[in-house]
Design a protein with these regions (language model features):
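A generic structural motif
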Residues: 31-32, 94, 288
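Active-site core segments that coordinate phosphate-bearing ligands/cofactors
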Residues: 5-7, 100, 107-120, 124, ...
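Gly-rich Lys/Arg/Thr-decorated short loops/hinges at beta-loop-alpha junctions or inter-strand turns
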Residues: 34-41, 114-115, 165-172, 196-198, ...
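Short beta-strand-loop/turn "lid" adjacent to the catalytic site in phosphate-handling enzymes
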Residues: 59-94, 119-128, 157-178, 201-204, ...
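Glycine-rich phosphate-binding loops at beta-strand->alpha-helix junctions
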Residues: 13, 204-212, 228
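N-terminal glycine/serine-rich phosphate-binding loop of ATP-dependent small-molecule kinases
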Residues: 1-89, 101, 117, 145, ...
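Residue-level signal for inorganic ion chemistry
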Residues: 23, 46, 69, 96, ...
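Conserved beta-strand and immediately adjacent loop positions that scaffold enzyme active sites
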Residues: 15, 77, 173, 246, ...
Length: 374
């Protein structure tokens, strides 16, 4: 029976699964890595931390010759590589909000209506295109060294194979893909004066994109499929592959997701329209701080504890938290409030509130935020 290796490069950590062809989990491993916040609203990681985590997980799985490998992970991030394939600077992540001016620059250079017609989305601070412009505007020395721009999961593909490649679902979140035609937009790249050779070949999610080069605990020659952005990949796994089926996924962010009949721009700007991993299209509403809000709460109010105590105290608190309300906009927000400057807060706090009330209010704030997006 075939054995398949799945790799997920998340924001808080990576996960690797060994599956059989029926989808049964044979082995699994995970590893955490740090998140850097150099300034409020900024969010960065070292791509080497992703790679080291994936290597540890592959070693723990202990299967050197799976029949195929699939890659998924956090979307939108920008990994800048030089002519030697080395990382130029820490990656700017999906929840990094520093690029508001560059989003305005994109609309000014391309035209707001054309941007939305081509990409089916407004330029958003989390997307890759404004991050590339930010690097050009603010770190010209680093920008001058760039020869390739990858998404996070595609950096792992590169380290496994030596091949630069991406696929349609993740590339949709760059702000540079022609979403209806499912390939890079020369109009966007030309208007923004970006070198098309910096952006890798785009595959469909189910196409073979590369083969392992050997090392890192894996044999050479194992096919690596295109894979998918984390949300599209999760939707395939949960069956959200046809219109009328809705999925909700919770990680560092939270997403409400549904397949749609074709590419159509949401004129309210609240939902994204992307290529789906099943060769169709999908719409999704993204809330930036879901599990991320809980991790912040754990690290801040429960230092040294795992989530078990946090969950226990939150469960013991009364629904409504005696009037305490938490707004979970810790890194700005996208859906339905597209505002990178939005910030979280507690309101209704009084002396009678306990740590458990604070914990439960975070859960409730996340739940109502997702309902707001729905």
């Amino acid at each position: 029976m075939a054995k398949l290796l799945g790799i997920d490069v998340g924001t808080s950590g990576c996960k690797v699964l060994l599956l059989d062809e029926q989808g049964r989990v044979l082995r699994q491993a995970s590893a955490e890595y740090p998140l850097s916040v150099p300034q409020p609203g900024w969010s960065e990681q070292n791509p080497e931390d992703w790679w080291n985590g994936v290597q540890r997980c592959i070693a723990e799985i202990g299967e050197p010759n799976p029949d195929a490998i699939g890659v998924t992970g956090q979307m939108h991030g920008s990994v800048f590589l030089d002519s030697e394939g080395s990382v130029v600077r820490p990656a700017l992540l999906w929840n990094d909000q520093r690029t508001a001016a560059e989003c305005e620059e994109i609309d000014a250079r391309v035209g707001a209506d054309r941007v939305r017609a081509i990409t089916c989305n407004p330029p958003l601070t989390g997307f890759q295109a404004p991050k590339v412009l930010w690097l050009r505007n603010h770190e010209p020395e680093a920008f001058g060294r760039v020869r390739q721009v990858l998404l996070p999961k595609d950096y792992i593909r590169y380290r496994l194979s030596g091949v630069y490649a991406t696929e349609v679902s993740d590339a949709s979140g760059t702000g540079l893909l022609d979403v209806p035609s499912r390939n890079w937009s020369s109009e966007m790249l030309d208007a923004l004066q970006l070198d098309s050779t910096w952006f890798p070949r785009v595959y469909e999610s189910d196409e073979a994109s590369a083969k392992t080069s050997g090392g890192s605990g894996l044999a050479a020659g194992i096919p690596i499929v295109g894979g998918g952005g984390d949300q599209a990949a999760a939707a395939v796994g949960t069956g959200a592959v046809a219109p009328g089926i809705l999925s909700v996924s919770l990680g560092t962010s939270g997403v409400v997701f549904t397949a749609i009949p074709g590419p159509e721009y949401d004129r309210a700007g609240a939902a994204h329209t992307f290529c789906h991993a099943n060769r169709g299209w999908h719409a999704m509403g993204v809330m930036l701080s879901c599990g991320g809000a809980l991790r912040w709460l754990r690290d801040t109010l429960y230092p040294g504890d795992d989530y078990a105590l946090l969950n226990e105290e939150a469960a013991a608190a009364k629904p409504g938290c005696d009037g305490l309300t938490f707004l979970p906009y810790l890194t700005g927000e996208r859906c339905p409030h597209n505002d990178p400057a939005a910030r979280g807060s507690w309101s209704g706090l009084h002396l009678g509130h306990t740590r458990g009330d604070l914990a439960r209010s975070v859960f409730e704030g996340v739940c109502f935020g997702l309902r707001d997006g729905l």
